[in-house]
């Protein structure tokens, strides 16, 4: 009898032990929080109506809350008068419609709802069109239906608002919800739900919002919430993301947590970024034109510029742009009727060779093919025939910001955005029709005469 009792006790004890063991969570994070990588396609060429240089210039100034010059506003108003209110119009482009900006898929909520969003290193806010958005602002966009997400949680007394330089604005309320890029899943991500949307976004039906990849010091929530950059180091094996944007192609990608060595040639060279203003800011040391001339140009004080995947054009410091066009691009001129630099559409300006530096005096070089610069055919009455708005512009004297290096600057290179070490890396990559980019060399080696830009 005693033996039976002891055996029964052992059975009960064993069953209880199994129950205790199975109730203890397995060591390590749950699958949704496991560190993952993601490769997200970057689609271009879908914003068929927005190929207007002055409109892109206006849009960039507005984004950075830079006052809009009256001359530029007149040009944009003239353009918009020809465009139906529910679209952005169709303007002939050279060489084809595309390269306005790259949108990529993201999944939000539970169950997941897929939206195509603009991945933007010039903003810290991740916001979406949703069922909170006023009806008049939704013009064909896919919206995020918060009522269908079981994981959406409203953050009490939290709102967001962005005022643009043209005095338009976007605003709304803030939630936490599950946010996924491929296999990369972030729980409790800050999702800004739009109530009001600026017309510059509501007119783009293919894009359902933005993914902000700048630093949280510039996030526009009140009170301040974590931005995507704050979440990434906790969910990535390596706190980096890379960009491979392609000229007139939808084969580009954003990769998170790893470097795909098949996407570039030679070595990645890094320069430190200044994140004190919340942006990916670097310093432009100088430039040269790849045209056989002996001249290179260097700033007396390196110019602070911002790397921005969310801006279409390449805005270099004013002195550099003027010197490049006046000394190296025949028939280029600044047109007040277009409010920008214009060039013959059938021309191929010389490649723009650039140098970036940082506080530790690291210097890296790269070049933008001149064939990227004929951006949009001028179609206004009185515009010179055969001329195009150039993809290389300056911000002028309207701001202390000296440059915004947008997609035209970024497309020829492969970039690594290193969150942990606060640096950005560049490597050459094959550009059509070439199959290889070749080895990096000193691009200014034959420039024997230096001009100092003040």
Could you tell me what each predicted segment is?
Residues 257, 262-295:
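Active-site gating loop/helix substructures
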Residues 187-273, 371-434:
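Glycine-rich flap/beta-hairpin and adjacent strands of clan AA aspartyl proteases
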Residues 84-91, 96-197, 353:
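Signature of the N-terminal lobe/flap region of pepsin-like aspartyl proteases
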Residues 102-148, 152, 179, 210-214, ...:
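Aspartyl protease active-site motif detector
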Residues 3-115, 140, 168, 270-271, ...:
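Disordered propeptide/prodomain
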Residues 22-48, 53-61, 197, 355-454:
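Aspartic protease catalytic domain
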Residues 117-118, 256, 287, 292, ...:
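Extracellular/luminal ectodomains of secreted and membrane glycoproteins with large N-terminal domains
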